[in-house]
């Protein structure tokens, strides 16, 4: 609930593992709010969330990530002057110890792992490229890789086609099918049927 507004009322969703689930509704219908609750950005006033048969109180995006839930927001959350790899590992950096004592970020390992994930799901990105040099569809792929790098199994896409060209939409749909074929559960939020 927001002051004077009930964003979601009497909502029940049952989504099975490996399913592509579309949540369709007009702008302002509460779709993104509902997914923001599932991702821990908002706490529900009432009701319950059950993930893999267990009742959960998802209090933050970090906790959602621990539950293997990831979200690609309509407005990307990327640092423009960082590389793709730096954006993806931000907050979960792989570390090594110099001389066995001093921790530092192992970007070689990160680049290798990201390149492998990219290839596995048909995302086709170069982890060493700087985000400010990327087009919108490639930035979206970086957001998808951020989820995959954190082992997300439930992937929420908020209005994923809103800023894409028809060709980019076709490419995204293939990526989503690859993700589903890889055992991921997909939730698409959209107000468009095409």
Segments from the language model and where they lie:
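Glycine-rich phosphate-binding loops of nucleotide-dependent enzymes
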Residues: 1-194
């Amino acid at each position: 609930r927001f002051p004077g507004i009930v964003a979601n009322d009497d909502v029940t969703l049952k989504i099975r593992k490996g399913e592509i689930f579309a949540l369709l509704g007009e702008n302002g219908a509460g779709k993104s709010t509902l997914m923001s609750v599932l991702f821990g950005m908002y706490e529900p006033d009432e009701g319950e969330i059950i993930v893999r048969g267990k009742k959960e109180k998802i209090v933050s995006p970090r906790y959602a990530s621990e539950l293997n839930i990831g979200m690609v927001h309509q407005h990307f959350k990327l640092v423009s002057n960082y590389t793709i790899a730096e954006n993806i590992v931000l907050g979960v950096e792989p570390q090594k110890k110099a001389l066995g004592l001093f921790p530092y970020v192992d970007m070689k390992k990160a680049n290798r792992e990201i390149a492998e994930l990219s290839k596995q799901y048909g995302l086709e990105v170069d982890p060493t490229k700087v985000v400010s040099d990327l087009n919108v569809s490639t930035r979206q792929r970086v957001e998808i890789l951020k989820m995959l790098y954190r082992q997300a199994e439930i992937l929420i896409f908020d209005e994923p086609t809103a800023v894409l060209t028809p060709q980019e939409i076709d490419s995204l749909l293939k990526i989503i099918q690859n993700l589903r074929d890889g055992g991921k559960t997909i939730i698409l939020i959209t107000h468009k049927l095409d």
